[in-house]
Regions:
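Basic, glycine/lysine-rich polyanion-binding surfaces/domains
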Residues: 1-206
Length: 206
């Protein structure tokens, strides 16, 4: 895989209703004690649309998206019509979100879903910690809550590092999402035992 030219952006949200505005959209809870957190924005069908970093500033909310695939500003503008807020968008330096950024993320075991095909991803398959199931309504909330409480999640998305150069023969129920350098991002059956991957497949979980 080659990392295509990313589209990193920053959006600043101003206005008295900025907290309520973003709280009703994101999967995480901006009312927590943290001044900085990660979250997803989902489709109504509960699939990942954006992964964002949220920073609470004195007079605004800073939203950072490492690779804006679906026009985050237009998405916010659609929901902002009835809110007392204003939006400002800035392009970020692409050099900070290229191959080195992506490789460092994989080494740390972090999957930046902004570089994956969003339309097929359930958020709980990747970073379940980006979802607060107690916070109340947000876009896609009914779907992800049903998956959680009825234990309907069947897959996990994990990072593995190749420990040899042997030809890789993955089982049929493994889905390769990304192969980058010596790293693979795989979607696997949830309860699969991967402790023997080193000897059987030459893969080590990151």
């Amino acid at each position: 895989m080659k990392i295509e030219t990313p589209n990193p952006i920053k959006i600043l949200i101003y206005g008295e209703e900025r907290i309520d505005f973003i709280q009703n959209i994101i999967t995480n809870d901006i009312l927590s004690e943290s001044k900085s957190l990660y979250s997803y924005i989902l489709t109504p069908q509960g699939k990942i649309l954006f992964e964002i970093q949220i920073n609470l500033m004195n007079d605004c909310i800073e939203i950072i998206c490492s690779n804006d695939q679906s026009d985050l500003l237009s998405y916010f503008e659609k929901y902002a019509k009835l809110s007392d807020i204003s939006l400002q968008k800035f392009q970020l330096d692409k050099a900070n979100f290229g191959e080195s950024y992506f490789l460092d993320s994989l080494k740390m075991g972090k999957i930046d879903t902004n570089f994956l095909p969003h339309s097929t991803l359930n958020p709980s398959e990747v970073h379940d910690e980006y979802i607060n199931y107690q916070k109340g309504c947000f876009v896609g909330q009914e779907v992800v809550s049903r998956i959680k409480h009825r234990q309907l999640q069947k897959k996990n998305i994990l990072i593995f590092e190749k420990i040899n150069q042997n030809t890789l023969n993955l089982p049929d129920d493994f889905e390769l999402l990304i192969e980058f350098k010596n790293f693979l991002v795989l979607r696997l059956p949830k309860n699969i035992e991967y402790l023997n991957f080193e000897s059987e497949l030459g893969l080590r979980k990151v």
